[in-house]
């Protein structure tokens, strides 16, 4: 198994879009109404399209206790590789989304600990695409479900406690027990592992 932790490394790796389709890159990700959207880009995912995604988890932290009530649906972008975000109109909402979705709803999560969201199905759906290759980018898209969503999320430009994505995956032919790869020694009932 391989565990990859992916952090944003540029302002264009996270963004938010208002109900007026305006996109902001250099600020906290502010999803504060039922018409706002969040975009998070994980660059250079190392899993191949043959990998089994054991788990994928988004971790984020609210930036203020006055804006710590998430109520979002989390998708991934349905694309072989996701482009970085831009300030172009509707740059988040215009992106195709996965069938897989996770509801993320809570109140008063605070701003001192990370919240975790299971996005395993979304990541698996993208990695299984015919055009996916190791090293491609993957974007997560958060859709505010209602007007009760009031979340300011720490971003790349926040300077610390930024969001990140963890992907635990297994490639074909890896993670096999040593005994299953051993050679049979005459007179023995179980495989004898190769030494050296």
Indicate residue ranges for each PLM-predicted region.
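A mature extracytoplasmic/lumenal domain signature
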Residues: 57, 62, 76-78, 144, ...
């Amino acid at each position: 198994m391989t565990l990859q932790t992916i952090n944003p490394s540029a302002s264009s790796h996270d963004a938010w879009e208002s109900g007026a389709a305006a996109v902001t890159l250099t600020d906290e990700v502010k999803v504060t109404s039922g018409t706002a959207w969040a975009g998070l880009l994980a660059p250079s995912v190392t899993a191949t399209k043959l990998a089994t995604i054991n788990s994928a988890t988004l971790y984020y932290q609210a930036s203020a206790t006055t804006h710590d009530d998430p109520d979002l649906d989390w998708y991934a972008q349905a694309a072989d590789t996701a482009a970085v975000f831009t300030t172009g109109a509707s740059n988040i909402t215009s992106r195709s989304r996965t069938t897989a979705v996770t509801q993320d709803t809570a109140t008063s999560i605070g701003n001192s600990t990370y919240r975790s969201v299971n996005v395993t199905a979304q990541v698996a759906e993208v990695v299984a695409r015919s055009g996916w290759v190791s090293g491609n980018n993957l974007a997560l898209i958060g859709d505010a479900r209602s007007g009760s969503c009031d979340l300011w999320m720490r971003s790349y430009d926040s300077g610390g406690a930024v969001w990140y994505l963890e992907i635990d995956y297994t490639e074909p032919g890896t993670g096999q027990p040593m005994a299953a790869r051993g050679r049979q020694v005459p007179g023995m009932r179980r495989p004898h592992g190769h030494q050296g």
